[in-house]
UniProtKB/Swiss-Prot annotation:
This is Osmosensitive cation channel TMEM63C. Residues 98-117, 777-825 are annotated as: Disordered. It comes from Danio rerio. One of its GO terms (molecular function) is calcium-activated cation channel activity. Residues 76-141, 224-418, 494-497, 591-610, 658-664, 720-825 are cytoplasmic. InterPro entries: Csc1-like (IPR045122), CSC1/OSCA1-like_7TM (IPR003864), CSC1/OSCA1-like_cyt (IPR027815), Csc1/OSCA1-like_N (IPR032880). Residues 1-50, 175-198, 449-463, 535-557, 630-632, 694-698 are extracellular. Its main location: endoplasmic reticulum.
């Protein structure tokens, strides 16, 4: 009887039937997806996807973690400022166990260094706002400023995306009526709520293209601000590898280059040696030397000091354990003498450990450009220029490239080269692939835990803490762990430069994070069985109950919103706490044999800031937010929150917790290239949605597909052009620059030739013999305070001690800085 009430023509009822059938199809799809995940804690139909509950829990835990950090920083202040220990008070802490009273110049002091802004319970929060880029640049180097500038550009980009997504895309999604009017339904905010016939779906595709354009423009602006520096490119020095190891006379290299390239003038040549063992012995003898100096000074004030040399003596300090006591000064003196003898013996043999690598410095960078161009053509079956001794030096086998910055070179890794390096790299990456892909993908771990009924007892309660917060916390935790595995795999690959190590780490981590945080969970492929069936079984999509429509379930978007919330609050707070580093720091202090070694631990605990790892992690969360910025626009504000908090945490950690790092500019350019992946993923997800919802031949689908192809083609073209442009700038850009003071090319060559050439020698080969005597202790001062020497009154004896202290500090300054992973210049 209902058919009698249809209007003539039957047009309206057909539309109503289409909507009803579509809704029934949506409901059946949801039922199938939820049924297939009935034992999974990831997909659950919760009020508003559990986002309010997860947000409240994260805010509370975030505040608790900040309180814990403030307490730890107040109680163990040295740990909160490890990077400053080396610069400000490592010397006097070593010799006197007290803070330095050395007078500071106005340029050395900063708001972050003052007692009121550095010692308070929560003063570190205000110091972040008062800290200027000039302070960070003077202490941490230009790479830190470039990284922070990159983050600010990403924040600005995310602000624009957030504004557009919340003011335009979100109202369009809410205007749909497919999922009802219940305000607790998270799906109303997603693209799933918009009917397939709605013309506003065009806005989603247009805005995806707009986001890509905005991203490209923003990164182009950041790229134009990157500084080119001569000390980074070292355009007048070439690194030549595959030189026969039996060649020890640099005159042969000079003769060949002069004959093959008559217009080129060689000013200096330095061969490389296997200094791995030598650097290890040097580190150990410096440690022993510091122990001797410390206890010699203490013995002059307090008499003979006895220590227990067993590694567990600090933990089991009672006399019942029976650890033998020895004279501290004598113990470290004998240890230093032994290590010094081994060091000198190894140094005498170092000339026999040539590596077939040489750094050749020319008078002008135009000369190096000629040689690099000739050898780059040699890769295309073009023989480089010959000389009368070509067969002797085997120049046709050489690999010639611009030398990296001296501070960028990891000298101890140069010994791993050739087939040995490639074999090591291939085996490590195969092992990494097997470990990460087959065992420890976070989505697979969460699914495996569900199979063992980890959350089954409370699933019946439909508790958002378990069904939403717990899985996202697990995904975040494993996402934190796995990049560190990737980092250590890059570390054991023995890259020759820190830039190369960081860049490889960044690329591998980013690809891994995108795969395991975005792709697998989005596709619902949370188990290996499901993944391989989807990959290889041609009948899988027809027979299985799990459809790809599950990708666009409302709660799947809520899962990523909750994940970004967890990363924004708990994630950034944990980065501030640095729990793994704190545990290592505590363990090293427990196993230190003496007070002197405790001081050594404090100095050497400050590590380099891992730009590759942090770039990858920042871009992962940015990519998650950008990928779902249109299909699930609620995620964008939390992505912006993450970027802001991440920026503040990194400012603090770079200044206070990590030592300066000098890198090649290529890693910053590579990070810019990877940012463009995010809007491309957004287009790909929108195309996926259009194909599933609208069909592959609909105009919106075709438009999205064409824009995706054009965006990928544009990105590839820009990447290739950037590679070519980088080669030209490396070769010729420095010719157009002048140094400070306006020196000409000839003057600059004369002044800096010797200094530049000497940089290309491992510092351990330039170190003088350590023969130092301790000085008396200066006036007592409470530890952890900074005193202005202008306000203190000293008598003649204290002035004399201060002069002696400054003399000793001058002699030992470079020695103590050698304890850090890199001595920044």
């Amino acid at each position: 009887m209902a058919f009698e009430s249809w209007p003539a023509g039957g047009v309206r009822p057909v539309e109503e039937l289409d909507v009803r059938s579509f809704l029934m199809e949506e409901n059946s799809t949801a039922e199938r997806c939820y049924r297939s995940h009935s034992r999974s804690s990831v997909l659950q139909g919760l009020p508003f996807g559990g986002v309010p509950t997860v947000l409240a829990i994260n805010v509370v835990l975030w505040l608790i973690l900040l309180l814990i950090f403030s307490c730890l920083r107040k109680a163990a202040w040295d740990y909160g400022r490890l990077a400053l220990l080396m610069k400000n008070d490592s010397l006097t802490s070593l010799f006197y166990g007290e803070q330095s009273e050395k007078e500071k110049t106005p340029s050395d002091s900063s708001p972050s260094d003052s007692e009121t802004k550095d010692m308070g319970f929560c003063s570190w929060l205000t110091s972040l706002y008062h800290m200027k880029d000039e302070e960070i640049r003077s202490k941490c180097g230009i790479d830190a400023v470039t990284y922070l500038s990159f983050q600010r550009h990403i924040i600005l980009l995310m602000m624009v995306v957030c504004l557009l997504s919340l003011t335009i895309i979100l109202p369009v999604n809410l205007s749909g009526n497919l999922l009802g009017d219940n305000p607790e339904n998270f799906g109303r905010t997603t693209v799933v709520n918009v009917p397939a016939q709605n013309i506003f779906l065009w806005l989603h595709s247009i805005f995806a293209l707009l986001y890509f354009v905005i991203t490209v423009l923003c990164m182009a602006h950041h790229s134009s601000r990157l500084e080119y520096r001569e000390d980074e490119k070292v355009a007048r020095t070439l690194m030549i590898t595959s030189i026969p190891r039996e060649i020890s006379d640099p005159g042969l290299i000079t003769k060949h280059l002069h004959e093959a390239y008559p217009s080129c003038t060689v000013t200096d040549i330095h061969f490389c040696f296997n200094v791995q063992k030598l650097m290890k012995l040097d580190s150990e003898r410096r440690k022993a030397m510091k122990g001797r100096l410390y206890f010699t000074t203490k013995a002059q004030k307090n008499g003979r000091i006895m220590i227990k040399t067993h590694p567990c003596a600090q933990i089991f300090c009672c006399d019942i354990c029976g650890f033998e006591k020895v004279d501290a000064e004598q113990y470290y003196s004998e240890l230093e003498e032994k290590l010094t003898d081994e060091f000198n013996a190894e140094k005498n043999w170092i000339s026999m450990k040539r590596l077939g690598i040489a750094f050749v410095t020319f008078r002008d960078e135009r000369m190096t450009a000629v040689i690099v161009k000739d050898y780059s053509r040699a890769r295309c079956r073009h023989k480089p220029q010959q000389s009368s001794i070509t067969t002797v030096v085997r120049s046709h086998q050489w690999d010639v490239s611009y030398a990296p910055a001296p501070n960028d070179i990891i000298w101890e890794n140069l010994s791993v080269c050739g087939p040995r390096w490639w074999l090591r790299c291939i085996l490590l990456n195969i092992l990494l692939f097997l470990l990460l892909f087959f065992l420890t993908t976070p989505a697979i771990i969460v699914n495996t835990m569900d199979k063992f009924n980890v959350t089954r007892p409370v699933e019946s309660l439909r508790n958002p803490v378990i069904t939403q917060f717990f899985p996202t916390l697990l995904l975040w935790a494993f996402s934190i762990l796995l990049p560190f595995i990737v980092y250590y795999s890059s570390f054991f690959e023995y890259h020759w430069t820190r830039s190369g190590e960081n860049q490889v780490t960044m690329h591998k981590c980013f690809l891994l994070l995108v795969f395991m945080v975005i792709i697998l969970p989005s596709l619902g492929l949370s188990s290996l069985n499901l993944f391989f069936r989807w990959l290889f079984d041609v009948r899988f999509l027809d027979e299985t109950d799990v459809k790809f429509q599950c990708v666009f379930l409302p709660d799947n978007g809520a899962f990523f919103v909750n994940y970004v919330i967890t990363s924004s609050l708990i994630g950034t707070a944990m980065e501030l706490l640095r729990i793994p580093a704190l545990l290592v720091y505590s363990l090293r202090l427990c196993f230190a044999k003496s007070k002197a070694e405790c001081i050594h631990v404090k100095i050497s605990q400050a590590y380099e800031f891992q730009f590759g790892l942090e770039y990858a992690w920042t871009m992962c969360i940015f990519s998650v937010s950008m990928t779902y910025s249109i299909t699930c626009p609620v995620i964008v504000p939390f992505g912006l929150l993450y970027l802001v908090l991440k920026h503040m945490v990194d400012r603090y950690n770079i200044y206070y917790a990590y030592t300066p790092t000098k890198l090649n500019q290529r890693i910053h350019a590579a990070a810019i290239s990877q940012v463009v992946v995010a809007p491309i993923l957004c287009m790909f997800w929108l195309l996926f949605f259009s194909v599933l919802r609208l069909g592959p031949v609909q105009p919106i689908t075709l438009f999205t597909f064409i824009t995706l192809l054009c965006s990928i083609a544009f990105s590839c073209f820009g990447f290739c052009m950037k590679k070519l442009r980088a080669d030209r700038s490396t070769s010729y850009q420095m010719s157009d620059q002048t140094t400070e003071g306006g020196f000409s090319d000839a003057e600059r060559s004369t002044i800096s030739t010797t200094a530049t050439a000497n940089l290309f020698i491992a510092s351990v080969l330039l170190e003088p013999e350590l023969g130092l005597t301790p000085m008396p202790s200066p006036a007592h001062q409470s530890y952890g305070t900074m005193v202005n020497s202008q306000s203190s009154v000293r008598d003649a004896e204290e002035d004399e001690e201060k002069d002696l202290e400054e003399t000793l500090e001058t002699e030992l300054k470079d020695d103590l800085l050698m304890d850090s992973p890199v001595a920044f210049q």
